[in-house]
C-alpha cells in the first residue's frame, strides 16, 4: 500500500502532466492549423511550436520520473535513454532562452548598434536559432556519449545513486564543463535578455504614468500585464534551473521524502509557463476557449 503523501504526490503529478500536455498541445495544434491554412508560420509561432513540442516530451519524462519515485521502479540507465533525456532537457532550455531573447529584441528599446541590428534581424534569425540549438545540443550529447559514466543529464546524475552503477567518477573538469555547457551559458543569455526587457518595460510604464496621470487611456495596462508575464517567466525559468543545480550537488535516494517535492516543482515550469503564454496570446487564448466549449458540448 502506498502512503497517503505518495498518493497525493501521484495525483498532483497526473494533474501536472495533463495540464502540461494540454497547454503545450494547444500551442502546437493552433500553430499547426495556421501553417496548413496559410502555408507559412510566423517566426514567433515557429519558436513557440518547437518549444511546446520539446515541453511535451519533457513533461512525459518528468511524469516518468514521478512514477519511478512513487512506485520505486528500477531506473534503467542505458546510454540511449540518457542521451534522449539530455537532448530533450537541453533543447527545451535553449528554446526558452531564445524566446526570452525574441521578446527582448521585439519589445525592449536599447540605443546600441548591436541591439538595433538584432531588433531588425530577429525574425529572420529565429530558424537559425532553432537549428543552432539543435546543433549545440547534439554536440553536447556527442561529448557525453564518449563518457559512459556521464551519459545521465547533469541534473539527474545523483537522483538514482542507489539504482544505477556509474562506471566512471566525475572529474572536476567534466563537472565544470557540464555545468557551463548545460546551464550557465543559456542561463546567462536569458538573464541578460529579460533584464533588458524588464528595465525597458518598467521605464515605459513610468513614462506612461507620468504622461497620462489621472486619465484613463485604452491599453494603459498592457505594459504592466506584459511586465508581470515576463516576471513570471523569469521566476519559473530561474527556479527551474536552480532546483536542477541544487539536485546536482546532492545525492538523493529514491525513497527520500524531499525528492518527490522537488520533481513536482521542476514540472511546474514547462506546464505553468505554457499556460501563461496561452493567457497572454489572444489567438491561443481564443482557440483554447473554443476547444473547451467544444469539449463541453460533446459531453
Swiss-Prot record:
Transmembrane segments: 10-30, 56-76, 82-102, 125-145, 179-199, 223-243, 258-278
Residue ranges that the UniProt entry lists as topological domain Extracellular: 1-9, 77-81, 146-178, 244-257
GO molecular function ontology, one term from the record: G protein-coupled receptor activity
Key words, A-Z: G-protein coupled receptor, Glycoprotein, Membrane, Receptor, Sensory transduction, Taste, Transducer, Transmembrane, Transmembrane helix
InterPro entries per UniProt: TAS2R
One Pfam family it belongs to: TAS2R
Superkingdom as given in the UniProt entry: Eukaryota
Intracellular or extracellular location(s): Membrane
A GO cellular component annotation in the UniProt record: plasma membrane
Glycosylation sites: 163
Miscellaneous notes: Most taste cells may be activated by a limited number of bitter compounds; individual taste cells can discriminate among bitter stimuli.
Protein name in UniProt: Taste receptor type 2 member 1
